[in-house]
C-alpha cells in the first residue's frame, strides 16, 4: 500500500516535469519563428518590392502577434505557478479570428458570424476579468 502511495505521488511530478520541458521546447521554437517573422516584416518594410502586397505584410504582422501571444502565454504559465490564465487564450482567439477575417473576407455572412464570435470572446474576457473568476496574483 505504501509503495502505491509513493508511486502515485511521483507520477504527477514526472508528468509535470515532462510538460514543462515540452513547453520550454515549444517556447524556444516559437521564439525562432517570431524572430523569423520579425525579419520578414522588417525586410518588407525597408526593402519593399513592388510585387509584395501590403495585404501579405498585414498577414505577417498578425502572425507575429500570434507568436508573441503564445510566447506570453507560456511565460505566464511559469510565472503563475503552472497555471494557464484563461484571458490569454481569449486574447489568442480574438487575434486569430481577426487575422482570419483579414485574410478571408470573401463572404459577408461569414465575416458577420466571425465578428459575433469576437463579440462573444470580448464578453467572455469581461467575465474572466471579474473578481468571480480572477485567480491570478
From Swiss-Prot:
Main localisation: membrane
Residues annotated as transmembrane: 13-33, 55-75, 82-102, 108-128
InterPro entries in UniProt: P_starv_induced_PsiE, P_starv_induced_PsiE-like
Species this protein is from: Listeria monocytogenes serotype 4a (strain HCC23)
Keyword rRNA-binding: no
PANTHER family: PROTEIN PSIE (PTHR37819:SF1)
Pfam families in UniProt: PsiE
Subcellular location: Cell membrane
Keywords noted in UniProt: Cell membrane, Membrane, Transmembrane, Transmembrane helix
Protein's name in the database: Protein PsiE homolog
Signal peptide: none
GO BP: cellular response to phosphate starvation
Family: Belongs to the PsiE family.
GO cellular component, one term: plasma membrane
Membrane topology: Multi-pass membrane protein
Keyword ATP-binding: no
